[in-house]
Amino acid sequence: MSRREDGRLDDELRPVTITRGFTTHPAGSVLVEFGQTRVMCTASVTEGVPRWRKGSGQGWLTAEYAMLPAATHERSGRESVKGRVGGRTQEISRLVGRSLRACIDLAALGENTIAIDCDVLQADGGTRTAAITGAYVALADAVTYLAAAGKLSDPRPLSCAIAAVSVGVVDGRIRVDLPYTEDSRAEVDMNVVATDTGTLVEIQGTGEGATFPRSTLDKMLDAAMAACDQLFEIQRAALELPYPGVLPEPGEPAKKAFGS
């Protein structure tokens, strides 16, 4: 089999690194790297829930995604300066939130909110899938922090791990984890979010250049699930290390929260 432009096999991920404790203030903070794509993912805890959630006894998890102006080859203006959030940004923010809510028991949080922030420092394809993969680890650290503070009714509210990967058809070949040079010319482009129990959370797929048969879809899903299995191993290895910071004592006011 001929190799890709970057030397990888079709089913091979780019080098993936997950660094916990990347910043000190949030309960969970991760730098995730998929090759040259780098995303900072944080998980912050705040008391209270959205108005429509009040009185339910359940918590909430929300997510925001953004790209730094110089994350790509050409600088893009900050959306905060433009005065409105773009459609792509809203779509990815909602995707990250949906993906992580699939793995957590919100009732265990009480009426508290975990806010996930994913900021793309450098983009080379697959930013949304990198964000989801890194954000899960940040969420796991935030849960560890809340459990240590005695804030959870269930100390183990995470039912599974969540990871995501891009997969596409490029030059007629199914390839995983597409960098920008491949993503920009893919005939079929897909993002797959999965759990470590073998189930799917979300599939986003498009025939960019042409239609594609069901058999291709099945092969793409097989390739994506195999790649996610590798990502789960990387997540587990990262989370085997001790919590990257000082955990609170039960009953002690949580310091890693908004406004602290």
From Swiss-Prot:
Protein name: Ribonuclease PH
Protein family per UniProt: Belongs to the RNase PH family.
Alphabetized HAMAP family for the sequence: RNase_PH
Pfam families: RNase_PH, RNase_PH_C
Gene Ontology biological process: rRNA catabolic process; rRNA processing; tRNA processing
InterPro entries in the cross-refs: ExoRNase_PH_dom1, ExoRNase_PH_dom2, ExoRNase_PH_dom2_sf, PNPase/RNase_PH_dom_sf, Ribosomal_Su5_D2-typ_SF, RNase_PH, RNase_PH_bac-type, RNase_PH_CS
UniProt keywords, alphabetically: Nucleotidyltransferase, RNA-binding, rRNA processing, Transferase, tRNA processing, tRNA-binding
Subunit structure: Homohexameric ring arranged as a trimer of dimers.
Catalytic activity from the UniProt record: tRNA(n+1) + phosphate = tRNA(n) + a ribonucleoside 5'-diphosphate
Organism ancestry: Bacteria, Bacillati, Actinomycetota, Actinomycetes, Mycobacteriales
Single GO term (MF): tRNA nucleotidyltransferase activity
Function comment: Phosphorolytic 3'-5' exoribonuclease that plays an important role in tRNA 3'-end maturation. Removes nucleotide residues following the 3'-CCA terminus of tRNAs; can also add nucleotides to the ends of RNA molecules by using nucleoside diphosphates as substrates, but this may not be physiologically important. Probably plays a role in initiation of 16S rRNA degradation (leading to ribosome degradation) during starvation.
Superkingdom, taxonomy of origin: Bacteria
EC main group: transferase
